[in-house]
Design a protein with these regions (language model features):
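N-terminal amphipathic, basic-rich helices that act as targeting or association modules
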Residues: 1, 283-293
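Cofactor-binding active-site loop characterized by glycine-rich and histidine/acidic residues
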Residues: 1-76, 81-111, 129-139, 143-146
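Conserved thiamine diphosphate
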Residues: 58-61, 135-167, 210-237
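Acidic, glycine-rich active-site loops and adjacent beta-strand->loop/helix elements
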Residues: 91-97, 119-125, 156-159, 185-187
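Short internal beta-strands
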Residues: 112, 116-120
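A general structural motif
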Residues: 127-137, 211, 287-290
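Glycine/aspartate-rich loop-and-adjacent alpha/beta segment that forms the canonical ThDP
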Residues: 171-278
Length: 293
Protein backbone atom coordinates (compact mmCIF):
# COMPACT_ATOMS: atom_id res chain seq x y z
CA UNK A 1 0.00 0.00 0.00
CA UNK A 2 2.82 2.45 0.78
CA UNK A 3 4.07 2.58 -2.81
CA UNK A 4 0.54 3.14 -4.13
CA UNK A 5 -0.03 5.87 -1.54
CA UNK A 6 3.10 7.69 -2.69
CA UNK A 7 1.69 7.62 -6.21
CA UNK A 8 -1.76 8.70 -5.07
CA UNK A 9 -0.27 11.64 -3.15
CA UNK A 10 2.12 12.53 -6.02
CA UNK A 11 5.22 12.22 -3.84
CA UNK A 12 8.78 12.42 -5.11
CA UNK A 13 9.61 8.89 -3.94
CA UNK A 14 6.78 7.42 -6.02
CA UNK A 15 8.46 4.50 -7.80
CA UNK A 16 6.01 4.69 -10.69
CA UNK A 17 6.64 8.18 -12.08
CA UNK A 18 8.27 10.20 -9.33
CA UNK A 19 4.97 11.80 -8.39
CA UNK A 20 4.05 12.98 -11.88
CA UNK A 21 1.24 10.64 -12.83
CA UNK A 22 -2.54 10.99 -12.87
CA UNK A 23 -3.70 9.56 -9.55
CA UNK A 24 -4.89 5.96 -9.22
CA UNK A 25 -3.46 5.03 -12.61
CA UNK A 26 -0.31 3.32 -11.32
CA UNK A 27 2.39 1.74 -13.41
CA UNK A 28 5.17 -0.54 -12.22
CA UNK A 29 8.32 -2.20 -13.51
CA UNK A 30 9.79 -3.98 -10.49
CA UNK A 31 10.95 -7.58 -10.54
CA UNK A 32 8.74 -8.63 -7.65
CA UNK A 33 5.32 -7.96 -9.22
CA UNK A 34 3.67 -8.03 -12.65
CA UNK A 35 4.56 -5.08 -14.86
CA UNK A 36 1.90 -2.36 -15.11
CA UNK A 37 2.31 -0.12 -18.15
CA UNK A 38 1.61 3.60 -18.24
CA UNK A 39 -1.88 4.46 -19.45
CA UNK A 40 -3.88 7.48 -20.49
CA UNK A 41 -6.70 8.73 -18.30
CA UNK A 42 -9.11 8.62 -21.27
CA UNK A 43 -11.80 5.93 -21.06
CA UNK A 44 -10.83 2.64 -22.67
CA UNK A 45 -7.41 3.83 -23.79
CA UNK A 46 -5.64 0.95 -22.03
CA UNK A 47 -7.08 -1.59 -24.49
CA UNK A 48 -4.89 -0.84 -27.51
CA UNK A 49 -1.52 -0.55 -25.69
CA UNK A 50 -2.09 -3.77 -23.73
CA UNK A 51 -3.09 -5.58 -26.92
CA UNK A 52 0.11 -4.23 -28.45
CA UNK A 53 2.10 -5.71 -25.57
CA UNK A 54 0.41 -9.06 -26.23
CA UNK A 55 1.35 -8.75 -29.91
CA UNK A 56 4.93 -8.06 -28.88
CA UNK A 57 4.94 -11.14 -26.66
CA UNK A 58 3.71 -13.31 -29.53
CA UNK A 59 6.35 -11.87 -31.86
CA UNK A 60 9.12 -12.46 -29.32
CA UNK A 61 7.91 -16.02 -28.78
CA UNK A 62 8.09 -16.68 -32.50
CA UNK A 63 11.44 -14.96 -33.06
CA UNK A 64 13.35 -15.36 -29.80
CA UNK A 65 11.66 -17.70 -27.35
CA UNK A 66 14.33 -17.29 -24.68
CA UNK A 67 14.48 -13.50 -24.74
CA UNK A 68 15.46 -11.86 -21.46
CA UNK A 69 12.46 -9.56 -21.96
CA UNK A 70 10.29 -12.43 -20.75
CA UNK A 71 12.14 -12.87 -17.48
CA UNK A 72 10.31 -11.84 -14.32
CA UNK A 73 11.66 -12.67 -10.90
CA UNK A 74 14.33 -15.20 -9.99
CA UNK A 75 12.45 -18.40 -10.84
CA UNK A 76 11.64 -17.78 -14.51
CA UNK A 77 11.76 -20.87 -16.71
CA UNK A 78 10.76 -20.12 -20.35
CA UNK A 79 9.92 -23.74 -21.14
CA UNK A 80 7.42 -24.01 -18.27
CA UNK A 81 3.79 -23.49 -19.30
CA UNK A 82 2.96 -21.72 -16.03
CA UNK A 83 5.68 -19.14 -16.78
CA UNK A 84 4.48 -18.20 -20.26
CA UNK A 85 3.88 -14.42 -20.22
CA UNK A 86 0.35 -13.09 -20.68
CA UNK A 87 -1.32 -9.68 -20.59
CA UNK A 88 -4.33 -8.61 -18.54
CA UNK A 89 -6.37 -5.57 -19.59
CA UNK A 90 -8.77 -4.30 -16.92
CA UNK A 91 -11.85 -2.42 -18.13
CA UNK A 92 -15.15 -1.04 -16.93
CA UNK A 93 -18.33 -2.17 -18.68
CA UNK A 94 -19.13 1.23 -20.18
CA UNK A 95 -15.65 1.53 -21.72
CA UNK A 96 -16.52 -1.35 -24.06
CA UNK A 97 -18.59 1.16 -26.06
CA UNK A 98 -15.40 3.02 -26.98
CA UNK A 99 -13.97 2.52 -30.46
CA UNK A 100 -10.47 1.83 -29.12
CA UNK A 101 -11.78 -1.22 -27.25
CA UNK A 102 -13.42 -2.60 -30.39
CA UNK A 103 -10.15 -2.14 -32.28
CA UNK A 104 -8.28 -4.02 -29.57
CA UNK A 105 -10.77 -6.88 -29.47
CA UNK A 106 -10.72 -7.17 -33.26
CA UNK A 107 -6.92 -7.26 -33.37
CA UNK A 108 -6.58 -9.70 -30.46
CA UNK A 109 -9.07 -12.07 -32.09
CA UNK A 110 -7.52 -11.78 -35.54
CA UNK A 111 -3.98 -12.51 -34.35
CA UNK A 112 -4.87 -14.81 -31.45
CA UNK A 113 -2.92 -12.89 -28.84
CA UNK A 114 -2.29 -14.03 -25.23
CA UNK A 115 -4.42 -11.39 -23.50
CA UNK A 116 -7.24 -11.44 -20.95
CA UNK A 117 -9.82 -8.65 -21.06
CA UNK A 118 -11.23 -8.42 -17.53
CA UNK A 119 -14.43 -6.35 -17.63
CA UNK A 120 -15.88 -5.22 -14.31
CA UNK A 121 -19.58 -4.71 -14.96
CA UNK A 122 -21.23 -2.61 -12.26
CA UNK A 123 -24.01 -1.28 -14.46
CA UNK A 124 -22.65 2.27 -14.42
CA UNK A 125 -20.42 4.30 -16.72
CA UNK A 126 -19.29 7.04 -14.33
CA UNK A 127 -22.69 8.75 -13.87
CA UNK A 128 -24.50 7.03 -16.76
CA UNK A 129 -26.56 3.87 -16.28
CA UNK A 130 -26.09 0.82 -18.49
CA UNK A 131 -29.52 1.44 -20.02
CA UNK A 132 -28.34 4.87 -21.15
CA UNK A 133 -24.95 3.72 -22.43
CA UNK A 134 -25.14 0.33 -24.15
CA UNK A 135 -27.32 -2.38 -25.68
CA UNK A 136 -25.49 -5.46 -24.39
CA UNK A 137 -22.91 -6.44 -21.81
CA UNK A 138 -19.29 -7.16 -22.75
CA UNK A 139 -19.75 -10.92 -22.99
CA UNK A 140 -22.63 -10.58 -25.45
CA UNK A 141 -20.80 -7.87 -27.39
CA UNK A 142 -17.65 -9.92 -27.92
CA UNK A 143 -19.58 -12.79 -29.52
CA UNK A 144 -19.52 -10.87 -32.76
CA UNK A 145 -15.75 -10.98 -33.03
CA UNK A 146 -15.17 -14.73 -32.93
CA UNK A 147 -11.88 -16.16 -31.76
CA UNK A 148 -12.23 -14.78 -28.23
CA UNK A 149 -13.22 -17.16 -25.45
CA UNK A 150 -15.55 -15.64 -22.87
CA UNK A 151 -17.13 -16.29 -19.51
CA UNK A 152 -19.40 -14.36 -17.14
CA UNK A 153 -18.95 -14.58 -13.38
CA UNK A 154 -20.25 -13.15 -10.12
CA UNK A 155 -17.40 -10.79 -9.30
CA UNK A 156 -18.70 -10.28 -5.76
CA UNK A 157 -18.02 -13.96 -5.00
CA UNK A 158 -14.32 -14.18 -4.14
CA UNK A 159 -14.07 -17.97 -4.32
CA UNK A 160 -15.73 -18.15 -7.73
CA UNK A 161 -13.69 -15.22 -9.05
CA UNK A 162 -10.41 -16.70 -7.81
CA UNK A 163 -11.12 -20.12 -9.30
CA UNK A 164 -12.34 -18.81 -12.66
CA UNK A 165 -9.46 -16.37 -13.06
CA UNK A 166 -6.94 -19.08 -12.19
CA UNK A 167 -8.44 -21.33 -14.87
CA UNK A 168 -8.53 -18.52 -17.43
CA UNK A 169 -4.93 -17.53 -16.75
CA UNK A 170 -3.84 -21.16 -17.05
CA UNK A 171 -5.71 -21.55 -20.35
CA UNK A 172 -4.29 -18.39 -21.90
CA UNK A 173 -0.77 -19.35 -20.79
CA UNK A 174 -1.25 -22.78 -22.34
CA UNK A 175 -3.34 -22.11 -25.47
CA UNK A 176 -2.09 -18.57 -26.29
CA UNK A 177 -5.41 -17.05 -27.31
CA UNK A 178 -7.53 -14.09 -26.10
CA UNK A 179 -10.15 -14.43 -23.37
CA UNK A 180 -12.78 -12.04 -22.02
CA UNK A 181 -14.07 -12.33 -18.46
CA UNK A 182 -17.20 -10.32 -17.65
CA UNK A 183 -17.46 -9.95 -13.86
CA UNK A 184 -20.73 -8.63 -12.45
CA UNK A 185 -19.77 -6.42 -9.50
CA UNK A 186 -21.44 -3.81 -7.27
CA UNK A 187 -20.53 -0.12 -7.32
CA UNK A 188 -20.00 0.76 -3.67
CA UNK A 189 -17.93 3.93 -3.70
CA UNK A 190 -17.42 7.15 -5.61
CA UNK A 191 -16.04 7.20 -9.14
CA UNK A 192 -13.51 9.83 -8.06
CA UNK A 193 -13.27 12.37 -5.26
CA UNK A 194 -15.01 14.80 -7.61
CA UNK A 195 -17.67 12.47 -9.07
CA UNK A 196 -19.41 11.46 -5.87
CA UNK A 197 -22.08 8.76 -5.71
CA UNK A 198 -24.65 10.90 -3.90
CA UNK A 199 -24.69 13.32 -6.84
CA UNK A 200 -26.42 10.91 -9.22
CA UNK A 201 -27.45 7.72 -7.40
CA UNK A 202 -30.61 7.10 -5.38
CA UNK A 203 -30.72 5.51 -1.95
CA UNK A 204 -32.55 2.56 -3.51
CA UNK A 205 -29.78 2.00 -6.06
CA UNK A 206 -27.07 2.19 -3.41
CA UNK A 207 -28.93 -0.24 -1.15
CA UNK A 208 -29.28 -2.71 -4.01
CA UNK A 209 -25.55 -2.63 -4.70
CA UNK A 210 -24.63 -2.98 -1.01
CA UNK A 211 -26.41 -6.34 -1.00
CA UNK A 212 -23.57 -7.64 -3.18
CA UNK A 213 -20.72 -6.16 -1.13
CA UNK A 214 -18.02 -8.87 -1.45
CA UNK A 215 -16.52 -8.26 2.00
CA UNK A 216 -19.46 -9.49 4.13
CA UNK A 217 -20.01 -12.30 1.62
CA UNK A 218 -16.43 -13.48 2.04
CA UNK A 219 -16.57 -13.05 5.81
CA UNK A 220 -19.70 -15.19 6.01
CA UNK A 221 -18.10 -17.87 3.83
CA UNK A 222 -14.94 -17.97 5.93
CA UNK A 223 -16.92 -18.41 9.14
CA UNK A 224 -18.86 -21.24 7.50
CA UNK A 225 -15.52 -22.86 6.66
CA UNK A 226 -14.39 -22.70 10.28
CA UNK A 227 -12.41 -19.47 10.52
CA UNK A 228 -13.13 -17.88 13.91
CA UNK A 229 -14.37 -14.36 14.51
CA UNK A 230 -11.23 -13.65 16.55
CA UNK A 231 -9.00 -14.68 13.64
CA UNK A 232 -10.88 -12.38 11.28
CA UNK A 233 -10.71 -9.47 13.72
CA UNK A 234 -6.98 -10.02 14.15
CA UNK A 235 -6.44 -9.90 10.38
CA UNK A 236 -8.61 -6.78 10.04
CA UNK A 237 -6.86 -4.97 12.90
CA UNK A 238 -3.38 -5.81 11.63
CA UNK A 239 -4.32 -4.69 8.13
CA UNK A 240 -5.85 -1.44 9.36
CA UNK A 241 -2.73 -0.69 11.40
CA UNK A 242 -0.45 -1.38 8.45
CA UNK A 243 -2.50 0.88 6.19
CA UNK A 244 -2.57 3.68 8.80
CA UNK A 245 1.20 3.46 9.27
CA UNK A 246 1.89 3.45 5.54
CA UNK A 247 -0.42 6.42 5.02
CA UNK A 248 1.23 8.44 7.79
CA UNK A 249 4.64 7.77 6.27
CA UNK A 250 3.42 8.63 2.77
CA UNK A 251 1.97 11.96 3.89
CA UNK A 252 5.32 13.18 5.21
CA UNK A 253 7.35 11.82 2.28
CA UNK A 254 9.23 14.48 0.24
CA UNK A 255 7.58 16.25 -2.68
CA UNK A 256 9.00 15.97 -6.23
CA UNK A 257 12.03 18.18 -6.91
CA UNK A 258 11.11 20.83 -9.48
CA UNK A 259 14.46 20.64 -11.25
CA UNK A 260 13.80 17.01 -12.24
CA UNK A 261 10.54 17.72 -14.06
CA UNK A 262 12.07 17.09 -17.50
CA UNK A 263 13.83 13.84 -16.52
CA UNK A 264 12.83 10.73 -18.48
CA UNK A 265 10.58 12.63 -20.89
CA UNK A 266 12.57 11.36 -23.88
CA UNK A 267 14.51 8.14 -24.30
CA UNK A 268 18.24 8.95 -24.57
CA UNK A 269 19.65 8.28 -28.03
CA UNK A 270 23.10 8.32 -29.54
CA UNK A 271 21.71 8.79 -33.06
CA UNK A 272 21.74 12.54 -33.67
CA UNK A 273 22.65 12.74 -37.36
CA UNK A 274 22.09 10.78 -40.57
CA UNK A 275 24.94 8.51 -41.59
CA UNK A 276 25.54 5.80 -44.17
CA UNK A 277 24.87 5.38 -47.89
CA UNK A 278 21.53 6.03 -49.53
CA UNK A 279 20.42 3.28 -51.88
CA UNK A 280 20.07 3.75 -54.76
CA UNK A 281 22.52 6.67 -54.88
CA UNK A 282 21.13 9.98 -56.18
CA UNK A 283 17.61 8.58 -56.37
CA UNK A 284 14.69 11.01 -56.20
CA UNK A 285 13.52 11.73 -52.66
CA UNK A 286 10.04 10.52 -51.70
CA UNK A 287 7.88 10.95 -48.63
CA UNK A 288 8.23 8.19 -46.05
CA UNK A 289 4.53 7.34 -46.27
CA UNK A 290 4.71 7.08 -50.06
CA UNK A 291 7.78 4.83 -49.81
CA UNK A 292 5.92 2.49 -47.49
CA UNK A 293 3.09 2.17 -50.01
Amino acid sequence: PYELMLQLLAKGNDIFTGGREYYSHPNYNGNDKPTIIHQSSATGMQAIPTTGVAQGIKYKEQQMAHSSLFMKGSHYEPSAINHQPIVLCSLGDASVTEGEVSEALQFAALHQLPIIFLVQDNGWGISVTKEEARLTNASEFVKGFGGISRISIDGSDFAQSFEVMKNVVDEVRRERHPFLVCAKVPLLGHHTSGVRKEFYRTEEDLAKHYLDDPKPKLRKKLIELGVTENDLLKIENETAQNVATDFSNAVVAPEPIASTVSDYVFVPTTVTEEKGERSPINNEKVLMVDAAL
